[in-house]
Amino acid sequence: MSESQSASRDALRRARRVVVKIGSALLTNDGRGLDADAIGEWVDQIAALHARGIEVVLVSSGAVAEGMARLGWVTRPSAVHELQAAAAVGQSGLSQCYEEHFARHGLRSAQVLLTHDDLSNRKRYLNARSALRSLVALRVVPVINENDTVVTDEIRFGDNDTLGALVANLLEADALVLLTDQEGLFDADPRHDPEARLIAEGRADDPALAAVAGDGGALGRGGMATKVRAARLAARSGALTAIASGRQPEVLTRLMQGETLGTLLMPDHAPLAARKRWLAGQLQVRGTLVLDAGAVKVLREHGSSLLPVGVRRVEGEFKRGDMLVCVDEQGQRIAKGLVNYGSDEARRIMGQPSRRIEELLGYMESPELIHRDNLVIV
């Protein structure tokens, strides 16, 4: 192990607050309901970390698979309402299974179901953060899942890897651990290339990592591509991300002891401020602003506000306060932010200096299209 790798593993060993995401393949009997013994083993490891003073927040799949088993379904349905029904049936069983196993160690667990709306609304985001912080302070293990019963495709997180990263941001966790049925991230698909090598360590923002990521399996929605994106998102709050196989014995406790297992992705930059993390975590955007080269340069180099003069084109229909994405003229994402004007007004003032806003609109809400406090570089 190199000196830098040793330092990175030591950083994981020193982590005091960890978000652990366990995929459905590691919690179920190949989709035929929950594997209670496997869940018991995960709880044993989490309890061992608690005994070391490590705060653990668990993001757990398994509700849909449990619901499918209880309903007698063999294959995962494609209809959204059937998936929602399965989640509703299975969630209580999942929660009860965790509760019984944590009780063996004198620990309490709490079921927390979140939707993207909970984290996109600033007030609800802060409320969720306060509630989770209180649970952790009480030495209760939060067991978090997406509220599949009420969520729609348009506002879903998409997978529990992304949810885990957003929870890591929410709680300012030191680390995000993504446990899967694969050893980690490889430089090629190990199922088809016998020469594929495990990537022991990398940088979360390395664009080359996305090229070697694959798709998810039959039971879950998350493949390696989602795990790389999750690592990039978690890095915004300074969290490192470990991706490892949940098939290895005692993998969680061994990882947290600094053992070289799986892939470790380190953050590239200093942590974003809390409000910027919230902005960065917004998955739903209402429109797009296409920027000229000058505006791109100013945003990237100085983190300045976005003025109308730097906007070449406005796409989509939106209202004041909506989340927009800013792209360069080649379509590359530059930033996201909350806009000060609706789409009609934005089209009338784009490309114009701020001093002309009142002349063009009859009023001036703000000299900026997006203020720097409401803007995050992506």
UniProtKB/Swiss-Prot annotation:
Main location as per UniProt: cytoplasm
UniProt keyword annotation of Amino-acid biosynthesis present: yes
EC number in record: 2.7.2.11
Pathway(s): Amino-acid biosynthesis; L-proline biosynthesis; L-glutamate 5-semialdehyde from L-glutamate: step 1/2
Gene Ontology MF terms: ATP binding; glutamate 5-kinase activity; RNA binding
Cellular-component GO terms for this entry: cytosol
GO biological process, one term: L-proline biosynthetic process
Subcellular location: Cytoplasm
Keywords: Amino-acid biosynthesis, ATP-binding, Cytoplasm, Kinase, Nucleotide-binding, Proline biosynthesis, Transferase
Position of the signal peptide: none
Chemical reaction(s) catalysed: L-glutamate + ATP = L-glutamyl 5-phosphate + ADP
Domain PUA: 286-364
One Pfam family here: PUA
Transmembrane segments: none
Binding site for substrate: S61, D148, N160
Matching SUPFAM superfamilies: Carbamate kinase-like, PUA domain-like
Residues reported to bind ATP: K21, T180, D181
Superkingdom, natural source: Bacteria
Keyword Zinc: no
Family of this protein: Belongs to the glutamate 5-kinase family.
Function: Catalyzes the transfer of a phosphate group to glutamate to form L-glutamate 5-phosphate.
Protein name: Glutamate 5-kinase
Species whose genome carries this gene: Chromohalobacter salexigens (strain ATCC BAA-138 / DSM 3043 / CIP 106854 / NCIMB 13768 / 1H11)
